Amino acid sequence: MKLSYTRSLILTLTLAVFSSFAFGAKKIVFLADGGKNNEKHNHVDGNDILANALEESKLGFETAQYKGWPTDPKAFDGVDSVVMFCNGGKKHHLVMKHLDQFEKMINDGVGFVFMHYGVEVPKGRAGDLMLRAMGGYFEEHWSVNPHWKADFKSLPKHPITSGVKPFVQDDEWYYHMRFQPNMKGVTPILSAHPPQSTMNRPDGPHSNNPHVRKSMAAGEIQHIGWAYERPNGKGRGFGTTGGHYHKTWARDDWRTLILNAIAWTAGVEVPKDGVPSIPTLNIAIPK
């Protein structure tokens, strides 16, 4: 009898542990479009690297990956954060046809991570929702999209920078983002000074404009990765303009920073050394 009771107690405790783990698991939904090719805007494979790293981290993540907006009406049930890595602009492949659902998830406190071209939507309702979701976005005739080498000489103390050292990365770093007024709720994470050569292009929706020239002339540092905490604790967001080149996922500091950002937007306590991961790309780390 005593032995039977002991076994029952062990079984009960074991089930409780597993139930607790399952209940506490954080659900991350990754959305991508077809992108461009294997080397640039490789959204599907980029998401796959991040999703696998989260699953393998043993931190209690449950992930789902979709190409395009999910047709399954239950895809977002219980979601803690949504990662969007896709082409953007007026025909944003994921947001523009789903603004109502996007707004509902913001209202529900779901976290959001937008990367590279995915940070661009048209000014108006879509832009306003991006400000609510993650505190900033690429606005035509305000922001620009040149290629340049960003030198992140220092990083702020923040859960997203846990285990991340200053680094240099060549990328298509859009800058001069449209942020919340007075940067309210926004914490710059990646900031750098673009070279003056990024101002050599003629004026256009993405290339140059009087606003960015004024900012550059004033010597203002440009924030190209940022965290956002919504008012009244109603969710978190993160945006970054990097991610053009697929090879950059081989860089530990970049990969760790994005994994940390996903975890943070999902409400996970980021480990002091960052979310662990092993690079899966068989390529040389870019200089």
Language model features by range: what are they?
Residues 1-10:
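Bacterial N-terminal signal peptides that target proteins for export
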Residues 10-20:
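Bacterial N-terminal signal peptides
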Residues 36-41, 91-92, 196-200, 247-251:
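Short, solvent-exposed loop/turn elements at domain surfaces
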Residues 91-166:
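A glycine-rich, often tryptophan-bearing local segment used as a flexible ligand/cofactor-contacting loop or short
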